[in-house]
Structures are given as structure tokens and as C-alpha cells.
Design a protein with these regions (language model features):
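Helix-rich, well-folded core regions that mediate interactions or catalysis
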Residues: 1-161
């Protein structure tokens, strides 16, 4: 199929698990439809951007848009821009780029190391645009609006306050 990708099985597993995160008032047919759309959007993104890799949590960002009254093509168009600019750094094959802190700001890197703060303490917040920790839909949409209208590092800035 034109939507084959090495991460297809992981995408399907994650999307199937996210069914319990959907609003309770949705009918099972609507849930199935949203999950099918979610898989198609994610695979289209991965096939379109062959240099990028799927990460667990990307489906949560896409789901935020699919739950709005947007169709699948509009959701893909939004995500197509986001994966190129706002969340691109999350889509590389490894976290090697995070080591650039040592090169670019050794004083900050030294402080973080001394504080014994693991780099991943807020990683899921940033990777999912807070969808795992912000349970109120209106609050999540407000954060999403902020992230769309701001510098791509805004999710990190929010994590610091």
C-alpha cells in the first residue's frame, strides 16, 4: 500500500490504545472513524517526510486536531507544517541533537548535570503538547493555540513555569 512505513505497526498499536482517551460521549462508530483517520494522517506524514521517525505521543498531537470539526485533509495540512517546523526535532531517529547543549551552553549543561535532573522529566509534556497532563479539553486547546501561534520552543518555555 502507499501508506506502508517501518513504524506502521507502532502507529497502529498507539492509536488502538488511545481509544480510551477519547471523550466518553463519542459513539463507538465515531471512535473507530477517528482512529482510522488518525492512522491515515500519521502514515501520510511519515511517508511524505521519509527523513523523520514516528515517536510515541505524536498521535496525541494529531488527535487534538482530529477531535475538532476538521476533516482529515485539513488535519494533515496542519500537521504537515508542524512536522517541518514546530515538532521536527522530536521526529529525528535519536536524541543525539540534545547533546548539543554541551557544545552550545556548557554552563547550563553543567548546572543540569549537577542538579541530577534527568532530561526526560518533562519530555512527555513536550512530545504530546501536554495532552497527557492537561485533561480539560478547553485548556488543552488553549495551549495548542499558544503553540501554533508561537516560536517552536514554546512547549519547552511552558514546561519551565
Amino acid at each position: 500500500s502507499h501508506l506502508d512505513h517501518k513504524d506502521k505497526n507502532q502507529v497502529i498499536l498507539d492509536v488502538n490504545r488511545c481509544g480510551r482517551c477519547l471523550p466518553k460521549e463519542l459513539l463507538i462508530e465515531r471512535i473507530n472513524s477517528i482512529q482510522d483517520s488518525l492512522i491515515r494522517v500519521l502514515l501520510r506524514l511519515l511517508v511524505t517526510h521519509t527523513d523523520l521517525c514516528y515517536y510515541q505521543g505524536l498521535h496525541d498531537v494529531v488527535l487534538t486536531f482530529l477531535l475538532l470539526p476538521l476533516n482529515e485533509n485539513i488535519t494533515f495540512a496542519i500537521m504537515n507544517v508542524l512536522v517541518q517546523y514546530h515538532i521536527r526535532d522530536c521526529l529525528y531517529p535519536d536524541i543525539g541533537r540534545t547533546k548539543e547543549l554541551r557544545i552550545n551552553d556548557s554552563q547550563l549543561e553543567s548546572f543540569i548535570t549537577r542538579s541530577e535532573c534527568e532530561y526526560y522529566f518533562s519530555l512527555s509534556w513536550i512530545l504530546t503538547w501536554y495532552s497527557h497532563v492537561v485533561y480539560d479539553r478547553d485548556d488543552l486547546l488553549m495551549l495548542t493555540d499558544l503553540f501554533l501561534a508561537s516560536h517552536p520552543l514554546m512547549p519547552i518555555y511552558v514546561a519551565t513555569v
